[in-house]
Swiss-Prot record:
Record's subcellular location: Periplasm
Keywords annotated in UniProt: Isomerase, Periplasm, Rotamase, Signal
Protein name: Peptidyl-prolyl cis-trans isomerase
Chief location bin: periplasm
Keyword match DNA repair: no
Its job: PPIases accelerate the folding of proteins. It catalyzes the cis-trans isomerization of proline imidic peptide bonds in oligopeptides. This protein is not essential for growth. Presumably plays a role in signal transduction.
Catalytic activity reported: [protein]-peptidylproline (omega=180) = [protein]-peptidylproline (omega=0)
A single GO BP: protein folding
Length: 188
């Protein structure tokens, strides 16, 4: 009997490990943020983000749009507000059952639902109006902050101004120093 229990528990541990999500650490000049990617519920978006991380794309970019009680957006601009060249856009996964709640990470996009590339945002509040519905394609959630929401809140409340055509730009750059994968999902 004990042998059967040990075999079942061993199988469960292997299954749980195979379903584990990728963990990412984002270092900013205001502190660190740890993020869990939802590889199984948002495979396209999570893989896309991981690809940019592996290519060091986010290193040296900024949070270029921050709005208190809404969200912080980054992943596309350098400190001089020069937009970085990206890979091709991905399919919108906003109908994956995940909601834009406080602390979740979602893909930023244009009015075209399938236009997301490298830019992402972290919800600072529950933003249910960003979820997919019958009349709106929504914004795909693909991860969640598991440590460092105090840093996210600090970023969301920095003084902002307008920079050219861009509104809500931090007066002092909020830099993404590096983004690194801490552990990776091995499930196929």
């Amino acid at each position: 009997m004990l042998k059967r229990v040990a075999i079942v528990l061993g199988g469960l541990l292997i299954s749980a490990h195979a379903l584990a999500n990728t963990m990412v650490e984002m270092k900013t000049n205001l502190g660190n943020i740890e993020i869990e990617l939802y590889n199984n519920k948002a495979p396209i978006s999570a893989k896309n983000f991981e690809s940019y991380v592996k290519n060091n794309f986010y290193n040296g970019t900024i949070f270029h749009r921050v709005i208190p009680n809404f969200m912080i957006q980054g992943g596309g601009f350098e400190t001089n507000m020069k937009e970085k060249a990206t890979a091709a856009p991905i399919k919108n996964e906003a109908s994956n059952g995940l909601a834009n709640t406080r602390g979740t990470l979602a893909m930023a996009r244009t009015s075209n639902p399938d236009s997301a590339t490298s830019q992402f945002f972290i919800n600072v509040a529950d933003n249910n109006f960003l979820n997919a519905s019958r009349t709106d394609a929504g914004y795909a959630v693909f991860g969640k902050v598991i440590k460092g929401m105090d840093v996210v809140d600090k970023i969301a409340n920095v003084p902002t101004s307008t920079y050219g055509m861009h509104q809500n730009v931090p007066k002092q750059p909020v830099k993404i120093i590096s983004v690194q994968i801490k552990s990776i999902n091995t499930a196929k």
